Amino acid sequence: MSCCKVPVLIEAQVEMVSANELENKSLFRQEEDATQTKEASLMEQGSLSTSFPQHTPKAPKNSVLNSIKIVIFCNKLNLLLPFGPLAILVHYMIDSKGWVFLLTLVGITPLAERLGYATEQLACYTGPTVGGLLNATFGNVTELIISIFALKNGMIRVVQLTLLGSILSNMLLVLGCAFFCGGLVFYQKDQVFDKGIATVNSGLLLMAVMGILFPAVLHYTHSEVHAGSSELALSRFSSCIMLIAYAAYLFFQLKSQSNSYSPLDEESNQNEETSAEDEDPEISKWEAIIWLSILTAWVSLLSGYLVDAIEGASVSWNIPIAFISTILLPIVGNAAEHAGAIMFAMKDKLDLSLGVAIGSSIQISMFAVPFCVVIGWMMGQQMDLNFQLFETAMLFITVIVVAFFLQEGSSNYFKGLMLILCYLIVAASFFVHEDPHQDGI
């Protein structure tokens, strides 16, 4: 019996050993598979990091003379810079308001473009969040400076019409020219853009229309609780709400949904590296800050002469102040954005064109307009959001038309032509419109 039990025990031990070996092999294979998976993921991350390298801007080593050369002499538009000092000379020697206004208007044009350039250079060193705030602040600094000078002089209607004209110009003329030029270059197809972003922007513009529409309706229906004061109180309250909404929009754009607002290039890795190299700043951070200060001071100086000459230019040229404030001034302030939007559209980067045109309209309607109401509140000026019935209706119809054109998420040269023709109708309407506040107040 004992002899029979020995082989059985041996067989049991052999089976146990083989089972242990199988378990060890399976564990070893699992560890090996996990190691290979980790290595593969690391290799994939490494390949991604090499394909899309983190680009850090390299500060150029410029001298003062080289910085002056880059900012002043490397842009053909700066050939118009001498018109600014010439306007000041004409003001003191001839005192012709019409010529002072015209020369100042031309002299401010390159300064507005250089302000945008200096802002972009400084944004290269600050990162996307602060850079976005800089662009939001200095993107329409020319209109803000002109508006503050006019507000200081009590010319509330000039402030309202200038800001309104800038919104209309960006939505119709700038966007229309971008659609038209981009459509001519790519005439065989419809250019596409992000429909979701366009919907959010249209909603913000409609909110701005709401803030401007209700004080006008309250005024013309004579339904104020306290005549004269309820309209102003509503405007100031709505302005604070609009500023909060704009701050939330900036957070949404720069933080919460930053990926949606920074579309990736659909080109190859080589184009990605090329675009990263193009974003390297041309001047240093402190040079950009100094140039921003100089250009802002120069724009402020010329804006004072410009505002003083508006009424005289209107009389000498026999042109309504409403047309000068709504059409001529915004075209100068939007000159840089106009060129940038067209350039992006001709490169089939329509999201950037919309960011320039519609984004600037949002900045003015949701930031500049309520900001001027708050500044006027501090100055003791009774600026409100009642832009009068004609102007408010013009803004409302324009926003509806633009939102209708953006709802499909595509554009062509015909849509651009329609927007340009709409702007011509707006310009003609303001040319024959008699402003009830002829004194600018």
Curated annotation (Swiss-Prot):
Native species: Arabidopsis thaliana
The family this protein is said to belong to: Belongs to the Ca(2+):cation antiporter (CaCA) (TC 2.A.19) family. Cation/proton exchanger (CAX) subfamily.
Superkingdom, natural source: Eukaryota
GO MF: calcium:proton antiporter activity
Membrane topology designation: Multi-pass membrane protein
NCBIfam families: caca2, cax
Gene name of the record: CAX2
Official protein name in the record: Vacuolar cation/proton exchanger 2
Activity regulation details: Inhibited by excess of Ca(2+) and Cd(2+), Mn(2+), and Zn(2+).
Described purpose of this protein according to its UniProt entry: Vacuolar cation/proton exchanger (CAX). Translocates Ca(2+) and other metal ions into vacuoles using the proton gradient formed by H(+)-ATPase and H(+)-pyrophosphatase.
